Structure formats: structure tokens, C-alpha cells
Amino acid sequence: MVKCHLSTLMGMRKLKIIDVATETGLHRNTVAALYNERAERVEAVAIEKLCQFFECKVGDLFEYIPETEQD
């Protein structure tokens, strides 16, 4: 499983979904899907824009959790 930490990053800065969408140029639905961890796939350009906006690395935004650790 891949966990997205977008909600944490946004919470630390008290940002709303629309704020991130406006600043990054990403569609609101894309940001919302990542925020709610419902995204099934994410384009590299979206990851790049989010990393630039939050000044973070991909590993700060996403975390791989092996299936055995979920139990």
C-alpha cells in the first residue's frame, strides 16, 4: 500500500484543497483524491508540482507500507 501524506502537509500549513489546487494548477479533484487517499494513480507531473509547492521530496509526500505491516 502507498500512503499519501498530502493531508498532513496541508494541515501543517492550514491549507484547503482549493488553495493547493489554485497554487499548483492541479485540478481540484486530483488534489481531493490524494488528500482523501482515494487516488488509484497519480501522474508524475502532479507529484512534481506538489513537491515543488511543499518544497519536499517524493518520500515526504508518499510512503510505501508493505501489506504485512497493515495487519
Where are these regions (language model features)?
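Recognition helix of helix-turn-helix/homeodomain-like DNA-binding domains
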Residues: 26-41
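DNA major-groove recognition helix of helix-turn-helix/homeodomain DNA-binding modules
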Residues: 45-60
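Short, charged recognition helix plus adjacent turn
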Residues: 8, 33, 62-71
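The alpha-helix within a helix-turn-helix
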Residues: 10, 21, 51
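Conserved hydrophobic/aromatic packing and binding residues within compact polymer-binding modules
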Residues: 6, 20, 31-34
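A short, Lys/Arg-rich alpha-helix, primarily the initiator
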Residues: 1-16
